[in-house]
Amino acid sequence: IHENGYETKISSFDDYLTRANELHQKLLIEIKTSHKDSPQMMEYFLEKYGAKIKVYGHQMQSLDYKVVEKVREYDIDIPVYFILPYNSVFPRTVATGYTMEYSTLDEYFVTKLWNTEQKLYVWTINSSESFNKSFHLGVDGMITDDLERIKEELVTAQEDPEYSDLLLNKATEFFVY
């Protein structure tokens, strides 16, 4: 491909996964489906990549709940997240957890999640405001386009003496419900 005077090749998923494994870089692999996919697409994908995904500790996510179910059927130990573009009702799923757009995240959802063993990732965390909201609600992971900024925000938040108070308050709230 060519853009702004630069030229490069698009890597295949095989090459990308191999390189990530060499670098010990864990991936969150998103499976996007369409009506044109074969009914066996996930079986083929998991047959080819499932073992490596598990061994190297990668995770998966999809907006398509059938993908989540297929991954769980293949191997319950591969973490797979169900993408929720909106927070309207609390879902009951077999997913490891949920990936949610941060602006729809609220305390009600997080509180309901405490009663499960599921985790919560939020996207796209690129500002102090989105970081603070996500951090104070206790999400398990943040998806960002600005890793350096979020690392700095995390260090600052953890150095804040109110951080330990926040953890204590969250633990107390947990036992009140």
What are these regions (language model features)?
Residues 3-8, 79-177:
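C-terminal active-site rim and adjoining tail of enzyme catalytic domains
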